[in-house]
Design a protein with these regions (language model features):
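Positively charged n-region of N-terminal signal peptides that target proteins for export
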Residues: 8-14
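Sec-dependent N-terminal signal peptides of Gram-positive bacterial secreted proteins and lipoproteins
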Residues: 14-30
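Intrinsically disordered, low-complexity N-terminal segments that are enriched in acidic
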Residues: 29-143
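Alpha-helical and coiled-coil interaction segments, frequently adjacent to or embedded
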Residues: 82, 274-304
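Secondary-structure boundary elements
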Residues: 149-215
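Hydrophobic (often cysteine-bearing) scaffold residues that line and stabilize catalytic clefts
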Residues: 156, 177, 222, 226, ...
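Hydrophobic/aromatic-rich core segments of domains that either
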Residues: 224-288
Length: 304
């Protein structure tokens, strides 16, 4: 016991200090873990938005740059934030108190309807056709499979720049610019009935009619192709817009003169004639036909 007699008081103080430190850690472990994940880890990984990031904020999806989720709403908002920034791979953590995190991730991945709504609120170039999740303890890593390749984006940007330079001038009002783009799509795009029938009957079809590539390159498209094409051109002109979708259809919602108005180019395309029935109309008007119903929860700020 020589060492104890020699170091007596110092050793006792050391043991007490170690005991206090361990007690403090286990008592406040959750807060400490979250602190280091949120501050230390976040300081070393920054996700910058790409050229197609949209600086918007909505009722259903809100930007959340945190790397820690505490509930399912946090997960959806983090997903929206990093998909909107164009990220193809990103990770975040479940908070130490979030016991249902793995269950909620599995639930979202098994029924992707909530996640797919994100596509309506981001630039079409940042939209995706599939998403995967890898769970490693409390770390969640997502991989995004985008709708548009880099070569498609370059080709579309070249075409869109040409369309706008040849058809839009600075003297036009916002409504006039939208009308020009609306009419351009009608005159230069044909609805692809063959593709629509194949999809309806679960027949594989590798054409691009569901994308802007179909509308602007191949001049054959279904509703999602018309809608993406108009959305991309509106974003090029810095005109705020999103998409609205239900199980059977998708169309554009455009912010004009401080009001959100609907435009459905697909149903305005009657072949050789231009129809304006669904051009910049309010919600009551577009819902009257019974074909344009949508989730009032997801699109809550656009009901009137």
């Amino acid at each position: 016991m020589f060492w104890y007699n020699y170091y007596g008081d110092d050793m006792r103080r050391y043991i007490i200090l170690v005991f206090i430190c361990f007690s403090f850690y286990f008592c406040f472990k959750v807060k400490i873990d979250d602190f280091f994940q949120k501050n230390f880890f976040y300081n070393y990984i920054k996700y910058e938005g790409n050229d197609y990031y949209l600086d918007n904020d909505f009722n259903y999806f809100k930007e959340n740059n945190s790397l820690i989720a505490y509930n399912k709403e946090d997960i959806l908002n983090i997903l929206y934030t990093f998909i909107n920034k164009g990220c193809e791979n990103f990770s975040f953590y479940c908070g130490s108190n979030y016991k249902d995190c793995r269950h909620d991730i599995d639930e979202l991945m098994n029924d992707k309807s909530s996640i797919l709504y994100i596509n309506d609120f981001v630039h079409p170039y940042n939209s995706f056709h599939n998403i995967s999740a890898k769970i490693d303890k409390n770390k969640i890593t997502f991989k995004i499979f985008k709708n548009y390749s880099y070569s498609e984006i370059n080709e579309l940007n070249y075409i869109i720049k040409k369309i706008i330079n040849e058809n839009i001038n600075v003297s036009m009002s916002v409504r006039e610019k939208i009308k020009v783009l609306h009419n351009y799509l009608i005159f230069n795009t044909e609805y692809d009935n063959d593709y629509a029938n194949d999809i309806k009957n679960s027949i594989p079809n590798d054409k691009n009619s569901y994308k802007a590539t179909g509308a602007l390159v191949n001049h054959l498209a279904v509703c999602s192709g018309y809608t993406d094409a108009l959305s991309i051109m509106l974003n090029y002109l810095k005109i705020k817009n999103i998409k609205i979708s239900n199980d059977n259809h998708v169309w554009n919602l455009i912010y004009v003169d401080n009001v959100w108005l609907h435009t459905d180019v697909t149903n305005d395309d009657l072949g050789s004639d231009v129809n304006n029935r669904y051009f910049l109309v309010n919600t009551d008007t577009i819902k009257f036909d019974g074909k344009h119903n949508f989730s009032e929860n997801v699109y809550s700020e656009f009901q009137r």
